[in-house]
Amino acid sequence: MAKIVWDESGKRFYETGVKNGVLYVQDESGNYPKGVAWNGLTAVTESPSGAEATELYADDMKYLEIRSAETFGATIEAYTYPEEFEACDGSAAIANGVNAGQQDRKPFGLCYRTVVGNDVQGNALGYKLHLIYGAVASPSEKAYSTINDSPEAITFSWEVTTTPVNLDGFKPTACITIDSTKVEPGKLAELEKKLFGDTSTEAQLPLPNEIKAMFAEE
């Protein structure tokens, strides 16, 4: 039996950053066929909720505990957003350059990348890809103010709820995370080709079952 050792060199891990955001507007079939870059992404706060305990009693004692379903939400913050996101934010074009608000909000998917680092390699150790499915953005305020001697760009913010999608052998999920330090590089490259596209293929967001099959052990 090995003795526990704390804070070994190379095992002091951390996570930081957010970049390489990609928006995928969901189509009528529930797929995410065309991704576009989300420039100016500054923060994504993942906010799972639910899984609340209900205690059941019998024979004058605690009998068991059951938990409610868990849901996944998030907050997205950015200095700007892709034009394609306007349909996800309740806006519809009635003419070129003219939009009407308070319209139906299209569901969307999102991909973004965060850094995985340690005490030896720093931020170069690796990264995680975060994939979100079935997201719907809630209305949010936009606070415009006069330009002064300390100008600041507006930071847009959206609260997001999700509807999970099927994952064979597991409960439905709205989020998938891929750790570059643990998966096979070739399979990761195959996934990134789908997520980000190349000169011959459009970027698209594969569904969880496709990702499961892609990374299945041979």
Where are these regions (language model features)?
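Oligomerization/assembly interface segments of phage tail-like spikes and tubes
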Residues: E46-P48, L56-Y57, M61-F85, S150-V165
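Membrane-targeting and insertion segments and their boundary/processing signals
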Residues: A43-G50, I132
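Structured, beta-strand-rich domain cores
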Residues: K62-S140
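Short, charge-rich amphipathic segments
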Residues: A2-S9, L23-E28, C88-I94, T114-N118, ...
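Mixed-charge, glycine-accented linear interaction segment located at domain edges/termini
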Residues: P139-K142, T146-E218
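Polar/acidic, low-complexity leader/linker segments enriched in S/T/G and N/D
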Residues: M1-E46
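Short, well-ordered strand-loop elements centered on a beta-strand within folded domains, enriched
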Residues: Y14-Y24, N31-G35, A124-L131, G169-T177
